[in-house]
A protein has these predicted regions:
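Helix-to-loop junctions at the C-terminal end of transmembrane segments
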Residues: 67-79, 266-281, 369
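Structural signature of the two symmetry-related core transmembrane helices
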Residues: 82-96, 180, 282-297
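Conserved MFS/SLC helix-loop-helix module at the cytosolic interface between two early adjacent transmembrane helices
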Residues: 65-102
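Cytoplasmic helix-loop-helix junction between adjacent transmembrane helices
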Residues: 112-149
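Juxtamembrane intracellular "pre-TM" segments in multi-pass secondary transporters
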Residues: 1-14, 193-225, 408
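C-terminal membrane-cytosol helix-exit motif in multi-pass small-molecule transporters
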Residues: 161, 181-199, 390-395
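Helix-loop boundary and gating motifs at the non-cytosolic
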Residues: 11-61, 215-260
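C-terminal transmembrane helical hairpin of 12-TM major facilitator-type secondary transporters
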Residues: 282-326
Length: 408
């Protein structure tokens, strides 16, 4: 049923893409059910200080930094399929152990293992998808993957919100086991794929070619800013703020993430079409503006609890459209900037910027949230606005054939 639904999202892609996207949707269901409530579990249920819980989240991302480098190198040399399967196996075993996490050091250890796993399955996933589709269709395939992921995330978030209760630790343990099972299920889908032929004619220089590409480094800097100040805060810290400051219940938090996913499902492929023939830097600048608007609304919700849920709904809507634009542009831009034979290394570097954002965002954000919540959201909005200005300045420095999303 999932395969049929994903297949109807966009025609003219290889069947193997639909198999992969179906696995993505299944895995996203488990992630959507568990991830928004991890910090709430560590802080509100297990009594771990918010700063320490944020450090555990940052350790997750730190574990993914080195794993991303290794995973992409393996993807370039022997193909991405084995890398993805190894990461999924580690994630499955770690989430099966997560119900036994009760202290800060255990949470930090589990976070590091999950980050290492993500360095394999999440970053290798992009290489696998890009190898399964022709270049002119990549932005559609990545947009479709985003839709598939949000189908799972939305339903999972709603399910998690209905199950989770801070008064009963067992409800969170159910979510973690559910997430482990969906990681294992995703592995079954990946195992069905015919592994793409590994590119053994890798361009000499490896990461030296990446660090010498100044326009690409500029794109990565903007990416770090957006992930740090927007994406990393949405799943990790916004639910804690919504519950403890705005006074929103767990079920309503899950419903907010369902709205986030439904909006992305409805708009992602349409936005992927809209950005065709348009400059990618302008699209990313608009992303930053929408992210900033989201956090200013979240800040307002904390000072207007009577209308807090409605304001958060408006905030999550702005974030959703920003995410649609970001996902339609970001990964295809990275692939188009990469020389032949180095797509894996470039995607690895983009994965590092993502992981670095998740190191900085939760660690600093959790500390700010504990001390001065308003400063967190105001500062995040300012960073997003600065990122929008910075990406516009990069436009003329990018290769001509990478500046515009191709038409299909």
């Amino acid at each position: 049923m999932v395969s049929a639904l994903v297949g109807r999202l966009e025609a003219r892609l290889p069947r193997s893409v639909y198999v992969l996207q179906s696995g993505v949707a299944l895995n996203a269901f488990g992630n959507g059910a568990a991830n928004p409530f991890v910090l709430l579990y560590l802080h509100d249920v297990r009594g771990i200080p918010l700063a320490a819980a944020g450090l555990a989240s940052a350790t997750n991302a730190a574990g993914g930094l080195g794993a991303s480098l290794v995973g992409r190198t393996i993807s370039d040399r022997i193909g991405p399929k084995v890398t993805v399967l190894a990461g999924l196996a580690l994630a499955t075993s770690t989430f099966l152990a997560y119900p036994f996490v009760t202290t800060a050091w255990q949470a930090i250890l589990a976070g590091g293992l999950l980050g290492t796993a993500a360095g394999g399955w999440l970053t290798g996933q992009s290489v696998l998808l890009s190898a399964l589709v022709p270049p002119a269709r990549r932005h559609i395939a990545f947009a479709q993957q985003r839709v598939a992921a949000n189908l799972g995330l939305g339903l999972g978030g709603l399910c998690g919100g209905l199950i989770a209760a801070t008064t009963d630790p067992r409800t969170f343990q159910v979510l973690f086991v559910l997430d482990a099972l969906t990681f294992a299920g995703y592995g079954v889908f990946v195992a069905r794929l015919k592994a793409p032929v590994a590119n053994r004619s890798v361009v000499r220089g490896g990461y030296r070619a990446v660090v010498s590409d100044r326009p690409f480094l500029g794109v990565l800097a903007v990416d770090v800013a957006l992930v740090t100040a927007a994406v990393s805060l949405l799943v990790g810290l916004m639910p804690v703020y919504a519950r403890n400051t705005v006074g929103v219940r767990e079920g309503a938090i899950g419903a907010l993430f369902l709205v986030n996913s439904l909006l992305i499902i409805a708009a992602q492929l349409k936005i992927a079409r809209v950005v065709e023939g348009r400059r990618r830097t302008r699209a990313l600048a608009l992303t930053g503006l929408l992210f900033a608007a989201c956090w200013l609304l979240v800040l307002t919700a904390g000072h207007s609890r009577e209308y807090g849920l409605m304001i958060l709904l408006a905030a999550i809507s702005a974030m959703s459209f920003g995410e649609c634009i970001y996902d339609a542009v970001r990964s295809p831009l990275v692939v188009d900037l990469a020389p032949d034979g180095l797509a894996g290394r470039y995607l690895a570097s983009a994965g590092i910027s993502w992981q670095l954002g998740f190191v900085i965002g939760p660690a600093t954000g959790a500390a700010l949230l504990a001390l001065w919540p308003s400063a967190l959201w105001a500062g995040a909005a300012a960073v997003c606005l600065a990122a929008s200005a910075a990406i516009l300045r990069l436009d003329t420095k990018l290769p001509v054939d990478a500046r515009v999303t191709p038409r299909t």
